[in-house]
Curated annotation (Swiss-Prot):
The protein's required cofactors: [4Fe-4S] cluster
Assembly with partners or alone: Heterotetramer of 2 NUBP1 and 2 NUBP2 chains.
Location (main, coarse): cytoplasm
Localization (cell): Cytoplasm
CDD domains found in the cross-reference section: Mrp_NBP35
Protein name from the UniProt record: Cytosolic Fe-S cluster assembly factor NUBP2 homolog
Lineage, uppermost ranks: Eukaryota, Choanoflagellata, Craspedida, Salpingoecidae, Monosiga
This protein's UniProt keywords: 4Fe-4S, ATP-binding, Cytoplasm, Iron, Iron-sulfur, Metal-binding, Nucleotide-binding
Cellular-component GO terms for this entry: cytosol
The family this protein is said to belong to: Belongs to the Mrp/NBP35 ATP-binding proteins family. NUBP2/CFD1 subfamily.
């Protein structure tokens, strides 16, 4: 492994062409963090931007499935790992899932090995010029998060998006995540409430299954922007399971407007502008 100073300098050079870095965090698993990360990446692509999506959720990598590339593997070059590209080379994807023999293989590693893999992921991937790198992190707060934030310190990430659900337990967990961000000096760019009621696929009416408005109240507590609430929508889940571009193929879905509405506030936070007036679907 490279000496610490050498590692940081190598990483800084690797990410020199990346304009913005956004981490997506959640206080616990199962709240839809990867769903939000994937849709933010896709939404930015539809604005004509070039995006990287780095899946560092080592024990539950779901990004490959969401983009229909779970059966593919990445290749190495003399420069390092080459990410998979989709959508006219405008989306670069890297995930631990590409390195496993099968999608059902369990990753049972101790902390030091996980941290070493995170350093590899960050420093040995050949990213091209990117408008934004979206990092899908593991759930919770652990040594892995400390490793990610520490490794990126010279690259000055823009901040983090916190994903929660309306339930009290999830909100309590994400409060701890917000405290982690404060201690790590990582700006909270916004809060997203996922699974905010159940959206009927027929009439699109939303029924509250849990308490309502918890994510927005949390955002007020920590003085962070509330980016929106996404209802439980079978069409969204089915689209992701099929590896489809939800924003392009499911515009009649009950959750479509809520998902699409996340993009403008994120771009405003990052100071990004739409690269083209053409928001048509990029080819795969």
């Amino acid at each position: 492994m490279a000496a610490p100073n050498e590692f940081y300098e190598t990483l800084k050079q690797r990410l020199a062409g990346v304009k913005h870095i956004v981490l997506v965090l959640s206080g616990k698993g199962g709240v839809g963090k990867s769903t939000v990360a994937s849709q933010m990446a896709i939404g930015l692509i539809h604005r004509g931007l070039k995006v990287g999506l780095l899946d560092i959720d080592l024990t539950g990598p779901s990004i490959p499935t969401m983009f229909g590339v779970a059966d593919q593997q990445v290749h190495t070059s003399s420069e390092g790992w080459v990410p998979l590209y989709k959508y006219d080379q405008r989306l670069a994807i890297m995930s631990i899932g590409f390195l496993l023999d099968s999608r059902d293989e369990a990753v049972i590693w101790r902390g030091p090995k996980k941290n070493a893999m995170i350093q590899q992921f960050l420093s040995e991937v050949c990213w091209d010029e990117l408008d934004c790198l979206v990092v899908d992190t593991p759930p919770g707060t652990s040594d892995e998060h400390l490793s990610i934030v520490d490794a990126l310190k010279l690259c000055k990430p823009d901040g983090a998006i916190l994903v929660t659900t309306p339930q009290g337990v999830a909100l309590s967990d994400v409060r701890r995540e917000a405290e982690f961000c404060r201690k790590a000096r990582l700006k909270v760019l916004g809060v997203v409430e996922n699974m905010s009621g159940f959206a009927c696929p027929h009439c699109k009416d939303c029924t509250n299954l849990f308490s309502k408005g918890g994510g927005e109240k949390l955002a007020q507590e920590i003085a962070a922007p509330f980016l929106g609430a996404i209802p439980i929508d079978p069409m969204l889940g089915q689209s992701l399971s099929r590896g489809e571009d939800f924003l392009a193929s499911c515009q009649a879905a009950p959750s479509y407007e809520a998902v699409a509405a996340l993009i403008d506030p994120l771009m405003a936070q990052l100071g990004l502008v739409q690269a083209t007036a053409d928001t048509s679907t990029p080819s795969h």
